[in-house]
């Protein structure tokens, strides 16, 4: 096959050479393509407007000087014009497309097997970080000993390999059932329709998994994103070490998983708070699953208002967990997000007993570690408390960070002692 060659504008290759996997539409200068019997050269804009290279085709990326950078999938409907899938030339991929994908799935799965057992639930594939752009795969091991997979195809670069991916997942992971959750808005930016539902054999939409000895109900069809936030699994286990005999406040609790890990560790009392009534009902279900009703209580409230109210009432805690949703999903909103993160941290510090533990998280790539720890320092100053950072964590082992692709390093989790 004769694959089109996309040449970047001068200087635009730097990030890709450093490991970045996207080429944006405004970074591409010209394209060489094979038209009938000969190679032709045309401006990128002309290629797009005249459809000379079709969406979903594999193309090769070159620097302006002609240095080969990698092969990827083209999509004219997205600002991300090419998502790189290989450092090899395109013909290497298409000599054995099924084998190409099978190896990637095997590599990703075997990496997780170093840390997780057959009875664990974990992320098998973390899109670009596993060199499978746009593909997310979660593996859930249910209480009734069945393997469920939840898959997301969020980019055309994943969609074009759909059949090969599903075949590889069946062979490598041998799931009882696979549920597709390609229902995120980002698919529309890729020119793709949203999809969800069972792929082949049907299973139970709601299952129970065991995490760190805690029973958790996971709604595969309606739960947030892919059903459950597996990225905090190891952080929840680590935080539990500080909770024995303590009064714990778990804010933005969602499923109540942090609070229930605290309960499992022997917490004296736990309050799980969330503004979403739906989240509170999920937390209540999980509390009942674990027989924790006497220790773990729920509150449906705006966390900002709740922290103010607790401060006004003079209520104190030994451990406070702040695990908010992303306060910013764009670089433009970082300043506003900084204020939000600072306020909840400042107020949490004020209602901690001396020597209390603050667990504080941010899950936005745009709010990087420098901004996060700067915010934490300013919150400590304004709360007139001295703060000792005991541990710094990111996402669990199943969410690797790809150097050169900073979006894969999105989670900050700090365990702090507040004097």
Predicted features along the sequence, with ranges:
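S-adenosyl-L-methionine
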Residues: 278-321
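C-terminal catalytic and target-recognition region of SAM-dependent MTase-like enzymes
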Residues: 357-419
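Conserved class I S-adenosyl-L-methionine
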Residues: 245-254
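Non-catalytic substrate-recognition/targeting regions of SAM-dependent transferases
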Residues: 125-138, 161-228
């Amino acid at each position: 096959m004769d694959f089109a060659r996309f040449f970047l504008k001068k200087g635009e290759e730097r990030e890709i050479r450093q490991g970045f996997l996207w080429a944006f539409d405004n970074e591409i200068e010209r394209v060489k393509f094979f038209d009938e019997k000969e190679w032709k050269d045309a401006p990128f804009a002309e290629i797009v407007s005249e459809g000379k290279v079709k969406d979903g085709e594999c193309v090769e990326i070159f620097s302006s000087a002609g240095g080969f950078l990698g092969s990827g999938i083209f999509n004219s409907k997205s600002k991300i014009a090419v998502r790189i899938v290989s450092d090899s030339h395109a013909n290497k991929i298409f000599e054995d497309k099924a084998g190409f994908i099978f190896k990637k799935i095997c590599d990703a799965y075997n990496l997780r097997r170093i840390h997780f057992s057959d009875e664990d639930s974990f992320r098998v594939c973390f899109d670009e970080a596993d060199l499978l752009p746009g593909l997310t795969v979660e593996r859930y091991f249910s209480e009734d000993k069945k393997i469920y997979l939840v898959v997301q195809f969020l980019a055309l670069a994943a969609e074009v390999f759909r059949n090969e991916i599903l075949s590889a997942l069946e062979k490598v992971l041998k799931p009882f059932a696979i549920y597709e959750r390609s229902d995120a808005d980002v698919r529309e930016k890729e020119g793709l329709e949203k999809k969800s539902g069972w792929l082949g054999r049907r299973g139970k939409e709601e299952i129970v998994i065991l995490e760190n000895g805690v029973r958790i109900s996971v709604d595969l069809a309606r739960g947030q994103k892919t059903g459950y936030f597996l990225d905090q699994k190891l952080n929840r286990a680590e935080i539990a070490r500080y909770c024995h005999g303590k009064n714990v406040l778990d804010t933005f609790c969602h499923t109540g998983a942090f609070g229930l890990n605290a309960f499992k560790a022997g917490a004296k009392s736990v309050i799980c708070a969330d503004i979403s009534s739906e989240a509170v009902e999920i937390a209540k279900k999980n509390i009942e699953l674990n027989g924790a009703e006497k220790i773990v209580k729920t509150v449906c409230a705006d966390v900002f208002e709740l922290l103010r109210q607790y401060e006004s009432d003079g209520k104190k805690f030994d451990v406070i967990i702040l695990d908010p949703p992303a306060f910013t999903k764009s670089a433009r909103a970082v300043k506003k997000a900084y204020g939000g993160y600072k306020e909840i941290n400042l107020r949490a510090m004020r209602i901690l007993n001396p020597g209390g533990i603050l667990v504080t998280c941010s899950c936005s790539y745009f709010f990087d570690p420098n901004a996060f720890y700067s915010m934490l320092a300013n919150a400590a100053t304004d709360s007139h408390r001295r703060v000792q950072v005991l541990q710094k964590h990111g996402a669990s082992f199943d969410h690797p960070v790809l150097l050169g692709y900073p979006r894969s390093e999105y989670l900050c989790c700090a365990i702090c002692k507040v004097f």
